[in-house]
């Protein structure tokens, strides 16, 4: 697991996998500094309730985990992430899955322990 301090300092540039579990209430924009290499993003165990509309800037993102957060619906922005094939939003309060939130290359969708 990495820290927000490492992310902000630029120490993580070039990594392919990022796991941040540090009570985040908003998406750290510094993640975009990893846009050319990041393939796996794990933001589980935070307090997030939304993702930014420009998440698709993470061009190589294949896997995203946002379990144990505060989402009430699957974010529509996921549907605009061209390479995304695995989405995990376990243990949130998700009640709605808009069709637009499902990426074209989606193979695995994990939504257990939601409402």
Language-model segments: what does each one mean?
Residues 12, 33-37, 56-61, 79-84, ...:
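Leucine-rich repeat
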Residues 8-49:
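LRR N-terminal entry segment and analogous cap-like coil->beta motifs
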Residues 6, 27-32, 51-54, 74-77, ...:
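The feature encodes a structural signal of leucine-rich repeats
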Residues 95-96, 102-115:
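Leucine-rich repeat domain C-terminal region
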Residues 1-4:
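N-terminal "cap/leader" segments of large eukaryotic alpha-helical scaffolds
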């Amino acid at each position: 697991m990495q820290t927000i301090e490492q992310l902000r300092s630029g120490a993580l540039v070039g990594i392919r996998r990022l796991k941040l579990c540090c009570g985040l209430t908003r998406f750290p924009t510094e993640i975009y500094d990893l846009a050319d290499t990041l393939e796996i993003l794990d933001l589980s165990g935070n307090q997030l309730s939304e993702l930014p509309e420009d998440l698709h800037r993470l061009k190589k993102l294949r896997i995203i985990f946002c379990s144990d957060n505060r989402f009430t619906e699957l974010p529509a922005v996921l549907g605009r992430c061209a390479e995304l094939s695995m989405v995990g939003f376990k243990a949130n309060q998700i009640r709605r899955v808009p069709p637009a939130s499902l990426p074209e290359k989606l193979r695995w969708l994990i939504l257990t322990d939601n409402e």
